[in-house]
Amino acid sequence: MSIEVANESGIDVSEAELVSVARFVIAKMDVNPCAELSMLLLDTAAMADLHMRWMDLPGPTDVMSFPMDELEPGGRPDAPEPGPSMLGDIVLCPEFAAEQAAAAGHSLGHELALLTIHGVLHLLGYDHAEPDEEKEMFALQDRLLEEWVADQVEAYQHDRQDEKDRRLLDKSRYFDL
């Protein structure tokens, strides 16, 4: 799976974390593992321009998604022809997201993970224009975020245990004389 990230926002964010959450969601949603995704991070001025051009709405927004093909919820970009399929582009605005994160009382990283999940779901055909769609999409988004965080915690704990085991084994070598 290829995920390209271009950060033109001027804000330092963890691109590895964005890729991690996108990969997690794509895998959980059973998308073809050869799928490709592009992520672009913009400043508020550039995002406002994009928002006006594509949505005819003034001001910046947090996330926009541009799917390559229209998909229905549950649809998969795993066409029978060989080769990777392009899901589309996700555009994030970290500066705008930072304001939302502060208002919600969580970190920018948490907000960007949430917005990445939101963007991927849009690429897969989910929407929130109608109340029922919103309920379904936001519940799925929250569940995926919770599962990704749990996965990250488990990986961290596993890495810490591996490090402890390595140090213990290194110390035990002194007794093998």
UniProtKB/Swiss-Prot annotation:
Keyword annotations: Cytoplasm, Endonuclease, Hydrolase, Metal-binding, Nuclease, Ribosome biogenesis, rRNA processing, Zinc
Chain segments annotated as coiled-coil in the UniProt record: none
Chief location category: cytoplasm
Record text on cofactor binding: Binds 1 zinc ion.
Family according to the record: Belongs to the endoribonuclease YbeY family.
Protein name: Endoribonuclease YbeY
GO terms for MF: metalloendopeptidase activity; RNA endonuclease activity; zinc ion binding
Sequence positions that bind Zn(2+): H118, H122, H128
One GO cellular component, as annotated: cytoplasm
Stated role: Single strand-specific metallo-endoribonuclease involved in late-stage 70S ribosome quality control and in maturation of the 3' terminus of the 16S rRNA.
Domain of life: Bacteria
Subcellular location as annotated: Cytoplasm
Primary gene name: ybeY
HAMAP family: Endoribonucl_YbeY
GO biological process: rRNA processing
EC number per UniProt: 3.1.-.-
Database matches in InterPro entries: MetalPrtase_cat_dom_sf_prd, YbeY, YbeY_CS
SUPFAM superfamilies membership: Metalloproteases ('zincins'), catalytic domain
Group of enzyme by EC: hydrolase
Cofactor: Zn(2+)
Keyword match rRNA processing: yes
